[in-house]
Amino acid sequence: MTRILHRQIHGTLPVAVGGKGVEIFDAQGKAYIDASGGAAVSCLGHGHPDVTAAIHAQADKLAYAHTSFFTTEAAETLADRLIEDAPKGMSHVYFVSGGSEAVEAALKMARQYFVEIGQSERRNVIARRQSYHGNTLGALATGGNEWRRTQFKPLLIETHHIDPCFAYRYQMPGESDEAYAARAAQELENKILELGPETVIAFVAETVVGATAGAVPPVADYFKRIRAICDRYGVLLILDEVMCGMGRTGTLHACEQDGISPDIMTIAKGLGGGYQPIGAVLLGQHIYDAFAKGTGFFQHGHTYLGHPIACAAALAVQGVIRRDGLLTNVQSMGARLRQRLGDRFGNHPHVGDIRGRGLFMGVELVEDRSTKATFDPKKKLHARIKREAMARGLMVYPMGGTIDGVRGDHVLLAPPFIVDEAIVDTIVERLGDAVDAALESVRSNVA
């Protein structure tokens, strides 16, 4: 009997006892290829000696120092590294313990920025439907995942949502990417004008949409148009790269591929690679200057901000990525993953879309390719795929509610940056078998 309140109360999980490279091992000795990086976290895989050595060394030196009393070498060095590699205009870093905390801090930072510069009437946040920004209340309110939000709506602050930039589901037949980008971005301007530009704090978006919709990249020029609209009305652009950032898409920051810089950016998962809980908010010089010239104080904080062991781990992770040229591997293995997925599923009668960037790929399942009709949500196809994949020693990240929080199924893939061709091929082979087995169980009406 477990004393843990697990995510799923019914059922028994295997006990993980070890990990090495791209594999996790359970107590029965079974190996699982971690093709999802957990939740797009384990960018270096498991048991990397450089990272564990850095953790050990920092623990021997200093395990904890509260940020109201001290800064630390580990935090200062990591901040320098992050800004050195940051998008243009980013000047400072605020450390937290994970993605939801990062989004909460970013929201408060954006609000306080306008208070500091004398625009305290700004109170509205705009985000996108079918987005996910975290499970704490502010982040949950900002996200557009209805399944996650529904029972907690009475507790959520008012936020406003527009449609996502989701070509497979929203681009009209015959509509060019340029026309679709313009139409999708126009929704933001319309919403700003509806609310009143003087009342809007920020627009929040995942650069590449993650778990909720399954690695959905924007069409070309969408974010350039979004950036221009935000600038036109003095609205801050907050990019959430908690899942898609820190190398996952083949560049350190996903927005590099869209040719823009945000005002504020959140990062987490790939920052520490799962070796320690850590996230961060990157902020532009203008945000910092408003605080510095105003109250000189950011009214926010948590006990474990800038935790030295977490910062040391993240610094080691980022050092390995840079030293070993792993972004190049993400690009080349990402191309192979896309090719192999196309080979296996390109003509599959129940795969509607294969999408993503780098080692961040989504496969959307449909009942009918021609109409894009989804499977009955009651069939829980995504859960069946996960079960079949685990049985085959493969960890993937399937989700339901791809379209509206209820309908749709997809599988998210986010393997470690260290994968090679053989591992990529094995991932796709096992996934193909798992998908076919799950579909057969649906057809056979097996529970």
Q: Residue ranges of each PLM-predicted region?
A:
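Conserved N-terminal phosphate-binding loop of PLP-dependent enzymes in the Aspartate aminotransferase
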Residues: 1-447
